[in-house]
Amino acid sequence: MDIGFMFSTPYAWLHQHVIGHHSFPNIVGKDPDLYHAPKYIRHSSDIRLKKPHFYQTMTFILTWLVGVPASLVCLGVFQAFNKPSYNKVVTFASNKHLNTDSLKLRLVLYGLVIHILPFILHGLTLRGLLFSILPIYFFSVCFMISSQINHLTPHNTEQFDKNFFKHQVITSHDVATDNYFVFLLTGGLNMQIEHHLFPSVNHCHLHKIRDHVRNTCRKHGVNYTESLTLWEALCQHVNHLRNFSKP
């Protein structure tokens, strides 16, 4: 993330993820993750229902393909220079430690490394074209799987609690926590509840505290939601999309 040109620039990521999403998960008008591509995908009731939303249970995969290159990288930089806030909900800061000084260079580096370098290495060939396109879009789908299914389900949206830690739990969703492949695929984000409660803890340690968190939630009557398989979580996400595709 200190280089930050292949995933998201640190400036945009801090506003979108750290300041916005982690502080206000699934809170309408506060969490920027509810407002990615709102013309095509509807995640909250304050987004006016439009015709493209009727088909979002089928078209969401298209937004997953471009989620990283178009939204996190390019649109994040564009908003930083041209908009007062990220996704209209997180006001951009500008100070000695948090500014846009290096954004243009990072965007150029992204274009060179991801899209131009393959042609330099392989020439104007089909191999060059495939290496220029497939890796970033494949990664984008993997990242969107890791980030969407663990918050955007019927059980976790439109939830709120004044207690900060309880709110983190009821708006997050654990996925296949006993599956090591899913852990590797998501980088540990499948233990999303634990990640939101302890965001600075390395994900390799989250499985050690998972049972303690689950038992504490049960003891105090806090809704701890989880899917036993990745497929179950994906189905839950599609159910969420279906719910918000209707008036």
Set out the residue ranges of the language-model regions.
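Membrane-embedded catalytic scaffold of the fatty acid hydroxylase/desaturase
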Residues: 1-97, 158-247
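Short low-complexity stretches enriched in small and charged residues
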Residues: 20, 101-104, 155-156
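Alpha-helical bilayer-embedded segments of polytopic membrane proteins, i.e.
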Residues: 54-71, 95-146
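Membrane-interfacial segments
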Residues: 82, 125, 150-154, 158
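C-terminal, active-site-flanking charged/polar segments
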Residues: 135-146, 152, 214-218, 223
